[in-house]
């Protein structure tokens, strides 16, 4: 009986086993879809070697998936195969049966390793995140444990940013940009230190650089030797976006020792030259003539773009110092100097022409031209020429006497010449008292200045004098400190508050302070109230740009005071004090333009000064 049933029992066991195996295989295939798909793809391989290699890859994939399940890790998007990555940029899709080579799963990394590894992985991750891009950001710890691929829109942003940087870089001179950045950092540090004890009490986040102050370190040397130097100031718009309207203007400084010559040259820029110290013989060379002028401190002259000129310092003892406002004509804010002669510092621009062009132009053999103009004789190697060291050279007293014979002095009787030098002190000062004087020539009075739309000023102040608070209606003023020291305060509107005007936030003013000394430059934007306090005997020059119809408006003093011209009815609405209080306050200052910075304190005067003007004037105290 048992023997008869045994085959049936055995058959049932086999049946149950086969069913279990089938269910197990089905379950395993469900849990291991990648391995199953990989095996099916191997069946299409007819070559035995490739078939075995394919099964080996599938087994490796199986082991990795089992390890992941054992470790309890959440499956991550697998790195993209290089071919698939190219498909994302529009290439033809590959056959589904062709499987990518498995990549090892990324292990958790320390935070300092993430940044280094990020660049290696950013082009290898699969684009699965694109399908789930709406999810919020994870915590930092999760990001460190489970690195995620960059989102596509981030890649696009990075790509556009990189392209933008490349285009920007191609349009700039990298050396000058790096120098500007270094100088900005240095100037930031200096301006923060100059704030003094008052600024040290402010929170650090409120300490910002003074974008209007350019100290002598902001100059870049173009030529220099033992006889002098030529320097150019950093571009205004590179210092601050607030100075964008000065992007077409540059400041040049020339300094030379006695008995020296600045070699003949021209520039692709209009020059407005002012003699700060010393004397000069400046000669303009034209096609059929030349004009030589004896210049001294306070003299000014326009040198049109493309005009060849040279400068001699004829004095035996005093250095010559000139300041120049340059207005480039080819490229905004950029200009070049073209020297006729070759020196060790630069080549003659004539050397840029071809040999046959020079021979035809001078109807002379090139060897003779090379010897006469460029100092190179036949057989000499480069570097053996008889050349001057730089563009500033020594000149003998005999040569100076010969050059002085035909030089004319600048006119002190007229300031309206179209092409001759003029002196800033040739007329009476427009503001003057025992504490200071201001001389000024405007475009309306001089054709040379009218063409450039610039006014010129020179100011002399005694130690302890205060140039009263005022603002210019249109002109942007560039101060050049020639001698002495001063403290300057400039008032503007805080940029942060400007951005909040639409939100009806109250406007706040910001005070820009600077300690100025010799060779410093300070820019005063139009409409910004400013005050200058001379801490020693002071002399400075000023270029007023966009000067036509400019008006200087004073905020204190007995004359030309804007506040005193406001009707009493409006004054009472504008200020907390009564019209009578405001009138008494204005009249308490008997001087105008230049006053004593430390007047004798009067008890009654102090009471009157403490409350009435809750306005922009408070920024000066």
UniProtKB/Swiss-Prot annotation:
Cell location: Vacuole, Aleurone grain; Endoplasmic reticulum; Protein storage vacuole
Necessary for sorting to protein storage vacuole as annotated region, ranges: 612-621
Residues with glycosylation annotation: 277, 533
Compositionally biased region (Acidic residues): 174-196
UniProt KW keywords: Allergen, Disulfide bond, Endoplasmic reticulum, Glycoprotein, Seed storage protein, Signal, Storage protein, Vacuole
Domain of life: Eukaryota
Residues of the propeptide: 25-62
CDD domains: cupin_7S_vicilin-like_C, cupin_7S_vicilin-like_N
Domain Cupin type-1 span(s) in chain numbering: 212-370, 422-583
Span of the signal peptide: 1-24
Record has Transmembrane helix as a keyword: no
Biased composition (Basic and acidic residues): 80-92, 111-173
GO terms for cellular component: aleurone grain; endoplasmic reticulum; protein storage vacuole
Keyword Nucleotidyltransferase attributed: no
GO molecular function term, any single one: nutrient reservoir activity
Protein's job: Seed storage protein. Accumulates during seed development and is hydrolyzed after germination to provide a carbon and nitrogen source for the developing seedling.
Note: A tridecapeptide (MITLAIPVNKPGR), called soymetide and derived from a trypsin digest of CG-1, stimulates phagocytosis of human neutrophils. The N-terminal methionine residue is essential for its activity, and the N-terminal soymetide-4 (MITL) is the minimal structure required for phagocytosis stimulation. Although not formylated at their N-termini, soymetides have a weak affinity for the N-formyl-methionyl-leucyl-phenylalanine (fMLP) receptor.
UniProt record similarity statement: Belongs to the 7S seed storage protein family.
Record's subunit section: The alpha-, alpha'-, and beta-subunits associate in various combinations to form trimeric proteins.
Protein name listed in UniProt: Beta-conglycinin alpha' subunit
Source organism of the structure: Glycine max (Soybean)
Encoding gene, per UniProt annotation: CG-1
């Amino acid at each position: 009986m048992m023997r008869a049933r045994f085959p049936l029992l055995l058959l049932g066991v086999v049946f149950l086993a086969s069913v279990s195996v089938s269910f197990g295989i089905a379950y395993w295939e469900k849990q291991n879809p990648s391995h199953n798909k990989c095996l099916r793809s191997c069946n299409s391989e007819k070559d035995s070697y490739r078939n075995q290699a394919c099964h080996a890859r599938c087994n490796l994939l199986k082991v990795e998936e089992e390890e992941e399940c054992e470790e309890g890790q959440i499956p991550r998007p697998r790195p993209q195969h290089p071919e698939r990555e190219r498909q994302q940029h529009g290439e033809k899709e590959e056959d589904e049966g062709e499987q990518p080579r498995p990549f090892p799963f990324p292990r958790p990394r320390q935070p300092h390793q993430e940044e280094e590894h990020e660049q290696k992985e950013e082009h290898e991750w699969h684009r699965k995140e694109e399908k789930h891009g709406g999810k919020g950001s994870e915590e930092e710890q999760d990001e460190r444990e489970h690195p995620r691929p960059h989102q596509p829109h981030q890649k696009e942003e990075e790509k556009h940013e990189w392209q933008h940087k490349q285009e920007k870089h191609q349009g700039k001179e990298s050396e000058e940009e790096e120098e500007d950045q270094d100088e900005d950092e240095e100037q930031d540090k200096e301006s923060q230190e100059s704030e003094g004890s008052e600024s040290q009490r402010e929170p650090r986040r409120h300490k910002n650089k003074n974008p209007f102050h350019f100290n002598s370190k902001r100059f870049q040397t173009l030529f220099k030797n033992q006889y002098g130097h030529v320097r150019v100031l950093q571009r205004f718009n590179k210092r601050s976006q607030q100075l964008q309207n000065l992007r077409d203007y540059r400041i040049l400084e020339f300094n030379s020792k006695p008995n020296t010559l600045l070699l003949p040259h021209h520039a692709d820029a209009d020059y407005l030259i002012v003699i700060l110290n010393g004397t000069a013989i400046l000669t303009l060379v034209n096609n059929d003539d030349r004009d030589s002028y004896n210049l001294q401190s306070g003299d000014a002259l326009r040198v049109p773009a493309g005009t060849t000129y040279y400068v001699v310092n004829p004095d035996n003892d005093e250095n010559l110092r000139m300041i120049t406002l340059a207005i480039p004509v080819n490229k905004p804010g950029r200009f070049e100097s073209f020297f006729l002669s070759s020196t060790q510092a630069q080549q003659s621009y004539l050397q840029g022409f071809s040999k046959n062009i020079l021979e035809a132009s001078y109807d002379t053999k090139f060897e003779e031209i090379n010897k006469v103009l460029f100092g190179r004789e036949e057989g000499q190697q480069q570097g053996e020429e008889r050349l001057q060291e730089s563009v500033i050279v020594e000149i003998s007293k005999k040569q100076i006497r010969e050059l002085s014979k035909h030089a004319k002095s600048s006119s002190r009787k007229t300031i309206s010449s179209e092409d001759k030098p003029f002196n800033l002190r040739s007329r009476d000062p427009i503001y003057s008292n025992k504490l200071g004087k201001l001389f000024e020539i405007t475009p309306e009075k001089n054709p040379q200045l009218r063409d450039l739309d610039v006014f010129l000023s020179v100011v002399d102040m005694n130690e302890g004098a205060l140039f009263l608070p005022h603002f210019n209606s249109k002109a942007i003023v560039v101060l050049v400190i020639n001698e002495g020291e001063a403290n300057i305060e400039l008032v503007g509107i805080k940029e942060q508050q400007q951005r909040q005007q639409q939100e009806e936030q109250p406007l706040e003013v910001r005070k820009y302070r600077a300690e100025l000394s010799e060779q410093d430059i300070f820019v005063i934007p139009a409409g910004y109230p400013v005050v200058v306090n001379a801490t020693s005997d002071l002399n400075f020059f000023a270029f007023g740009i966009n000067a036509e119809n400019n008006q200087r408006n004073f905020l204190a003093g007995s004359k030309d005071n804007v506040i005193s011209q406001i009707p009493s009815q409006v004054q009472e609405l504008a200020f907390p004090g009564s019209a009578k209080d405001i009138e008494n306050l204005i009249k308490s200052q008997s001087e105008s333009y230049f006053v004593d910075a430390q007047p004798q304190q009067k008890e009654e005067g102090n009471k009157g000064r403490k409350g009435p003007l809750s306005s922009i004037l408070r920024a000066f105290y």
